[in-house]
Amino acid sequence: LIDLVAELLRTGLIDENGILHSGQERSDTFMLVPPQETVFAQCEQNMSEDAQSEKTECLQRNEKNGSGQSRFENDCGVYLTQKDIGEVQLAKAAIAAGIQLLLKKRSIEESQIQTVYLAGGFGNYMSAENAARIGLIPESFVKKVQCVGNIAGEGAKIALLNKNERHEIENAVRNMEFLELAACPEFQDCFVDELGFER
């Protein structure tokens, strides 16, 4: 989903406010995108000769579904609605605002962060470049991202098998500070600022 939104943002089918546009509205920009560089390259390879002659239709379709909601759809049956984009904006704004408030809380700059650990399945399959493109993480974090997989499960195993490591974990937990974002006066303003997409 992050990759798709990032690609549509890059091609201009999604604007800075998250509005989904039709291929016809952005046809001048869209025609310049080589198929092999798009997320729909596989779709094009699977098309018949008749469909190949109208391959832009696969990339440009933006129609209404039964409820009258705008959506982007390709010939492979994959579609993205305006509501989906809105949900992405809400999620990425909350995370981006959280990052900015944590930096502010510790009085540090983005450049001082050495490594950004992404845990779980989410981190394993996320493109840091596309995450930055939609504003989920700062651009300066892209080359610092390290995917660590199921680190919670690994940590639990280590804690169960090694007393010294368990004590170290317990000490870290005792010294950990918890930042309740909803209780931060600046959160709402920061959240609203992060809702849009920078292009």
List each language-model region with its residue ranges:
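Helical "lid/coupling" subdomains associated with nucleotide-phosphate turnover
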Residues: L1-E44, F72-R199
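Intrinsically disordered, low-complexity terminal tails and inter-domain linkers enriched
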Residues: Q36-C76
